Amino acid sequence: MPTSATAVAPSTGSVQKKDQDWRAILSPEQFRVLREKGTENRGKGEYTKLFDDGIYSCAGCATPLYKSTTKFDSGCGWPSFFDAIPGAIKQTPEAGGRRMEITCAACDGHLGHVVKGEGFPTATDERHCVNSVSLKFSEISSQ
């Protein structure tokens, strides 16, 4: 079933579950990354080299997060995007201020980090470095 590219993110924090409920629906690796703020191994993610047309949603709650049109190859070893679907993610500064943690606005699942000012030739000069295991890809079928 095609996914709408104009999907609107639900209100902040609207998906809340207990750890036992998250464990029931997530793989152990998804739980470690999304709920415990882990990081998957560099270059091993399912979506690192995928550049098909579609939508990347939160693996925890299915909130649409990124359009494939904002994905680029940064060479960092994780899927990279230069912008998110408006309202879909939250950015929280980390100690030192060099990067921001990004989480799903709906379920607070850890996605990865945003680094700014690296000089990539994108519209925002931002790199949203996202764990593949935090994402679920849905292809947009062309008719």
Curated annotation (Swiss-Prot):
Gene3D superfamilies xref list: Peptide methionine sulfoxide reductase
SS bond list: C76-C129
Catalytic activities: L-methionyl-[protein] + [thioredoxin]-disulfide + H2O = L-methionyl-(R)-S-oxide-[protein] + [thioredoxin]-dithiol
GO (cellular component) term, any one: cytosol
Annotated positions binding Zn(2+): C58, C61, C104, C107
InterPro entries assigned: Met_Sox_Rdtase_MsrB, Met_Sox_Rdtase_MsrB_dom, Mss4-like_sf
Family as reported in the entry's similarity comment: Belongs to the MsrB Met sulfoxide reductase family.
Protein name from the UniProt record: Peptide methionine sulfoxide reductase B9
Lineage summary: Eukaryota, Viridiplantae, Streptophyta, Embryophyta, Tracheophyta
